[in-house]
Amino acid sequence: MGNKLGMGLDLLANKNIVNLALSGFWGFTPKLSKLALDGDIKGHNWPLGVVRQWINSIASGNDSYLSNIGMGTFIDPNVDGGRLNAKTDLLISLITDSWGKEKLCYPIFPLDWALMRASSSDLHGNISFENEALLGSSINDAIAVKRFGGKVIVQVEK
């Protein structure tokens, strides 16, 4: 994400480039955080695990992600709904699931970009993660972005 010193996603911290950012942790991107906190862009702060499962839900073709994570906290729409400023639209809603339990509904919406790193690629855009310490969620990130026609940008060594 960043290094607290202006690298990573902070290189894109410009209100003419970014209009909405959603994260589970903003600490490594102080410039992007400032844009959100100052109301220059829309900003959401959702629990990190929810963000991961939400992206997996997009990749899986779901319409939303339901969870009890965040109930009664700043994520709850009855509190702040995870919004970092007044400009940010409320996305999270409360619903009752089929078992009668109240859940937070994190709606699915198109993602425009996925940024990732890989070891190498070929002329067809196939990538390999042979030198990365952790594959993590890169595949689901790419699938989620491509679901709605977004772009995947990959930095490779070769």
Annotate the PLM regions:
Residues 1-158:
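Conserved alpha/beta enzyme-core scaffold
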